[in-house]
Amino acid sequence: MDTSKNTLLKFANLPAFEKITSKDMYQAISFLVQENKKIVKKIESLEKLTWKNFIYRMEESDDKIAKAWAPIRHLNSVMNDVKTRNQYEKSLSLLTSHYGKIGQNKKLFNQYQRFYEENKKNLNSSQKKLLADVLQGFKLSGVHLAPKQRKLFRDSQEKLANLESNFEQNILDSTNSWSKNYKTEKILKGMPKNSLEIASEVAAIRKQDGFT
């Protein structure tokens, strides 16, 4: 997978929205999820845990995923063409599945718990809060459930994510399909000139009089 030209994987600056393509979306999320899996695999077997080789690496990896995902969500909301929607839905499905499994990873949970117990005397309040939230997240994700219950929980999470996504897409479709036509400019008094010009152009495209 050649990701060298993927705009979503360049984290030095603010997102370059004008350069992001639909092809970039799932490719970026898939790549970052695979990288996250590799990091988790290494951390599971670490004997000596430090903030730098454990917590920082996990936070950095999760932060990259969040930074790539945020523009995808935004573009899905404001563009919502067929290609963008497909890439968004594929990416959402992958992320939901991945983090559902991460949240139930007992080896990783035990490493977090061990690190906290071994280092809590030397941690500042912010570090303690971060770890407390992470440990609580594992518990809320069903890390202590029996195997069959863990799978049921993950399946329910994925189903809920799909339902939420479908609901959002239906709202966008309804919003995009709705329009109101005004025959005269009088009722639109106060609207900026450029907005009126756009409304007039839309009306003309739809073979309507006035403004849409």
Give a label for each model feature:
Residues 1-212:
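Zn2+-dependent metallopeptidase catalytic domains
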